[in-house]
Regions:
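Canonical AAA+ ATPase core
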Residues: 90-95, 116-120, 128-220, 260-262
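C-terminal engagement/docking regions of AAA+ P-loop ATPases
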Residues: 1-3, 7, 239-319
């Protein structure tokens, strides 16, 4: 992809980012990472307390790219069929008909995904990894683009089922969506909690535009020195005395794709170290497990962030 083409295509993405920032106040970093996820063909896990705008983010993104949106509130009594769909017998036609579930959408908000059982959680694995679901030995393609934005509350642990490592590894990245600062919250109150802005949000792109951009991201050049840089960070997570579980090959692929998407959003057709460094924590933190050798006063959920930051600081940046 030529520099001119990269700039022309990424200009549309910049317009999309500006539109989302007008709705999601004070969370520019979360908006950027959500766009990195969709352009890198990945999925996003958001940790945050209720009421900070997670649902609004999903709705705004779907509306801005003129795509369908579904929200599923996960509970402990849900079944996989509540998400995927179910085959129902039709007496008139004397055959089973498949009734599609909410997963058949472009943007799926899986709200409080750790409130449901591992069986229901795992029903999303095939959808997230392969873009299809299998019910009663029949496979059904999901609409494209397909993005899962899952949320979980880091504070309320009662009655939750922590996501297993295999499920966490399917998410391109995990971000924390905390409280807005005072100025952003003032703007939210002035705009009636953002509802007016969401209602006035018009499509900036189409689903076809997003698919085109996903292909453009694949063509972003990554120098071999940057590949070595990323692999060195990955290697150190596997050898760290403070981590009982390092980053998997799927994780290293995720960082590579995310860095390409970051460069794309910056209007470049090539990656730099600055595309990789800020993504290490959001892409890797949920994939590693900190052991008891790491002495820290930080919360358990924040210790992985700190270990990764220390690893990045000690890896030489290519010039």
């Amino acid at each position: 992809m030529s520099p001119e083409t990269a700039i022309a295509v990424s200009t549309k993405a910049v317009e999309l980012e500006k539109a989302l920032r007008r709705v999601i106040r004070g969370k520019d970093d979360v908006v950027r990472l959500a766009l990195v996820s969709i352009f890198a063909r990945g999925h996003l896990l958001i940790e945050g307390v209720p009421g900070v705008g997670k649902t609004t983010l999903g709705q705004a993104l779907a509306r801005a790219i003129d795509c369908t949106f579904q929200r599923v509130q996960f509970t402990s009594d849900m079944l996989p069929s509540d998400v995927l769909g179910i085959s129902v017998y039709s007496a008139a036609d004397q055959k089973f008909e498949f009734k599609r579930g909410p997963v058949f959408t472009n943007v799926l908000l899986a709200d409080e995904i750790n409130r449901t059982t591992p069986k229901t959680q795992s029903s999303l694995l095939e959808a997230m990894n392969e873009g299809q679901v299998t019910v009663d030995a029949h496979s059904y393609e999901l609409p494209q683009p397909f993005l899962v934005i899952a949320t979980q509350n880091p504070v309320e642990h009662h009655g939750t089922y922590p996501l297993p490592e295999s499920q966490l590894d399917r998410f391109l990245m995990r971000v924390r969506m905390g409280y807005p600062d005072a100025q952003a919250e003032r703007q939210i109150l002035r705009s009636e909690a953002g509802v007016a802005h969401l209602d006035s949000l018009h499509p900036v792109l189409t689903g076809a535009d997003v698919l085109e951009m996903q292909q453009a991201v694949k063509n972003i050049r990554v120098d071999d020195s940057l590949v070595s840089y990323a692999l060195e960070i990955v290697r150190r997570t596997r050898e760290s005395e403070f981590l009982s579980l390092g980053v998997s090959p799927r994780g290293s692929q995720a960082l590579y794709r995310a860095a390409q998407a970051m460069a794309f959003l910056e209007g470049r057709n090539f990656c730099t170290p600055e595309d990789f460094k800020p993504l290490v924590v959001p892409v890797f933190a949920h994939r590693v497990v900190v052991n008891n050798l790491y002495a820290s006063t930080l919360k358990k959920s924040e210790q992985s962030d700190q270990v990764l930051k220390e690893i990045v600081e000690n890896v030489a940046v290519p010039v």
